[in-house]
Amino acid sequence: MLMWPQPHLPTHPHLPTHPHLPTHPHLPTHPHLPTHPMMSKETRQSKLAEAKEQLTDHHPQTNPSVGTAASDTKKKKINNGTNPETTTSGGCHSPEDEQKASHQHQEALRRELEAQVHTIRILTCQKTELQMALYYSQHAVKQLEGEARDLISRLHDSWKFAGELEQALSAVATQKKKADRYIEELTKERDALSLELYRNTITDEELKEKNAELQEKLQLVESEKSEIQLNVKELKRKLERAKLLLPQQQLQAEADHLGKELQSVSAKLQAQVEENELWNRLNQQQEEKMWRQEEKIQEWEEKIQEQEEKIREQEEKIREQEEKMRRQEEMMWEKEEKMRRQEEMMWEKEEKMRRQEEMMWEKEEKIRELEEKMHEQEKIREQEEKRQEEEKIREQEKRQEQEAKMWRQEEKIREQEEKIREQEKKMWRQEEKIHEQEKIREEEKRQEQEEMWRQEEKIREQEEIWRQKEKMHEQEEKIRKQEEKVWRQEEKIREQEEKIREQEEKMWRQEEKIREQEEMWREEEKMHEQEKIWEEEKRQEQEDKMWRQEEKIREQEEKVWRQEEKIREQEEKRQEQEEKMWKQEEKIREQEEKIREQEEKIREQEEKIREQEEMTQEQEEKMGEQEEKMCEQEEKMQEQEETMWRQEEKIREQEKKIREQEEKIREQEEMMQEQEEKMWEQEEKMCEQEEKMQEQEEKMRRQEEKMWEQEVRLRQQEEKMQEH
């Protein structure tokens, strides 16, 4: 007779049942077959426990977390068989609880997978954003480098333009000095011309006075000549009368007296003729002097015209220089506006870079937070694994006492877990080696980059030294050129001083000539006085010879008539000379007016030159201010370059960090892909297990039906035995 266990036996206190395991929805109970109150629970629980043990034996190494969870569920499912409601002799949970536990485990795994996939997507999005930010930052850095190069080239061009402006200013200054010297020469020549004009005016006045005196003398001579002619006629008449009236003695006496008078008259006429000849010579000399003065005046007029042309050319050159300076100022203003716009663009780009840096910092903080969360999740997983291992150890100790089969299965599981751990350790060691190799490579790359940076810095220092040397050479060449210009200017000054000395010597020579002429005039006056004395003596002698020269009177009268004609001609010539003198005076006045106009023009030019000097001084001040601005801009550019270098270093550090993060993310993605593959394999296995469980349940139902049939038969047999 079979003995069935009693339903009122207590369960084991150390083996609690799992309260959270739900029933499987795909395994409905059979509604038509009635279950035995004592046999159905035992058979079902024992068969389900054996099927789950077989499943854990088949797939224990797919996922360690799944395996631990399955072992935990197994440990929790094991029972002493003391619970009358759930167990009969095997001590297993109900299939509904196991199905609930498996569903909860699958849902938890799916949630973890979804969370990990979500984190992976977030990390990939952040990685793409970081890559885009890096690309834009690199593009901005390249643009800034190109703009910095453009600014440096423009600075060099501005420096060259400033040098050209300095050269132009120096040329203008030299031209101004030349113009000043030329103006000084013109003033000196003007003074010399004014002196000559003053002297010419004085000589003209003297000549006019002398001409007036000569005209008065000529009038006196003509009057005397007419009186002498009248006297001669009267004397002739008297002689004729005397010849008729007086005797011979009286006639001889009167003839002697008349001869003396004729001799005196002839002497006077000869003296007058000689004086006229002297005055004619003096007039000829004066005419020659006037012609020479006219030639000199023409030469001076030509020189003045040439000077006026030169002054016009200088004015045109000055106007061209002013136009060039205006154009250069406009170019400088345009360049300053461009520099201001570029500075504004640089400020805007710096603000954009700062914003990008802030975005990068925020993204880095987010990535750090994600990494911290990942580390926390890893720590939680490790803690859960440790707890699961501890629970496994405790449950394994309890199960060793209960079932030998479970020990064998657990030993197999442990061996498999040890293999997995060894594989994981090997993988970790390989990963550590790979990380160490990558770190070594990164350190080598960093060292190479540092060496490259050092070499680039050395090359830049050498380039700066070369540039400084070139600037020194250029400055030395400029100094040499300036010294050569100074030497040339000194030579020109010396030449001008020599010219001035020569002009002074010429002036001294002219003054000496004038003095000699004055001495000649004085000697001539003395000669005139001596001639007068001689004339008086001659007159006395001529009075004695008058009687002898009666015959010569007629000849002298003829000569006198000729001399009168000559005197008339001389008077006509004098009139012509006076007209010429008037014309020369008019020309001199016109020249004086022209000289005054030239002086006014020279004054205007001097005023213009002063204005140009003021403009050049203002331009020099502006150039100094511009040079100060350029120095400030260079300092700003250097500061910007330093900030750019710092930003580049920061960007490189960020790139390194991002690369490390990308490597970590790739590793995590690989791990996640492996986990996903494992999860897909686990899901496939779970689906296969569910199919097997359904098949086993169908088998169990068939077995239960057979058991029910056997029970019915046994009951019939028992009834028969009781009846017997």
From Swiss-Prot:
Residues 164-686 form a coiled coil. InterPro entries: GOLGA6L (IPR026737). The keyword Coiled coil applies. Residues 61-71, 79-91 have a biased composition (Polar residues). Residues 15-29 have a biased composition (Basic residues). Residues 1-108, 314-342, 374-454, 517-548, 561-724 are annotated as: Disordered. Keywords: Coiled coil. Residues 39-60, 94-108 have a biased composition (Basic and acidic residues). The keyword Ribonucleoprotein does not apply. Belongs to the GOLGA6 family. This is Golgin subfamily A member 6-like protein 6. It comes from Homo sapiens. The gene is GOLGA6L6.
